[in-house]
Amino acid sequence: VFTTMMVLLLGEIDISIASIMCLSGCCTGVAFEAGLPIVPAMMVGLLVGAACGFFNGILLVAFPDLNSTIVTLGNQILFRGIAYMILEDKPITSISSKMSFLAWSKVAGIPLILIVFFVETLIFAFVIHRTKFGRSLYAIGSNAKASRFSGIKTNQIKVLVFTLSGLCAGFAGLFLISKLGSARASIAKGYEMEVIAMAILGGVSTAGGKGKVLGAVLGVFSIGFLRYGLGIVNVSSQ
């Protein structure tokens, strides 16, 4: 959700993150089945995610008149299509025993995924609120043209943010296939709207230049509690 927040701060949007999660997970599974140890296979998934995000960013910089909604929507279909071409919706289950530690491990009784989320929160809070790079995000989102004239490298920052978005989506994809116990081309459908909703619910403006990490965290927990509550009363959250 934090890289989605960064994209929104720029006044852009990334609808392809769920498909990147899926493609990264599928590539991790394929790499593992091809004989790579689990850690290098996971690195393949992360690299695929970063490459997808980089592709989004490069397209938006190369064709500035294109809307990020249209670009990432098109790439959402493209990335999902590549995943189907690779797996044909045949699940890879051989990774379940090797990757289960991501979703189910605990450190001192605390789930690993919660620890990772806490560490990510601290890192992104520092980067967004305490660094020159973070201040540049707010400036670009508020007025991209003025930011460019003031010396901010808007194009480079845009490509970097979308690359980070893809990388983190790939990272989330690893946790997802770890939880599911398999990689398949149909996973993570609809997740992009949920993640964007978390950020917006936390007060991040879709117009750019406004939002806090704390708000995004509250958005995550709000959606999480909503899903949990629906589960208790046996109502699908999909």
Q: PLM features: residue spans?
A:
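Single transmembrane alpha-helix segments in multi-pass membrane proteins
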Residues: V1-A34, I58-D65, A199, G203-V213
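Alpha-helical transmembrane segments within multi-pass membrane transporters and channels
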Residues: L36-Q76, L218-G219
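Membrane-interface helix caps of multi-pass small-molecule transporters
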Residues: M6, V30, A34, A51-F63, ...
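Hydrophobic core segments of alpha-helical transmembrane domains in multi-pass membrane transport
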Residues: T3-T4, Q76-A83, V116-V127, F162-G173, ...
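Transmembrane helix-bundle core of multi-pass membrane transporters
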Residues: L66-F133, I157-L160, K179-A188, V235-S237
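Helix-loop-helix "hairpin" substructures at the membrane interface of multi-pass membrane proteins
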Residues: P37-G45, A51-N56, A108-A183
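Transmembrane alpha-helical segments in multi-pass inner-membrane proteins
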Residues: A169, A183-Q238
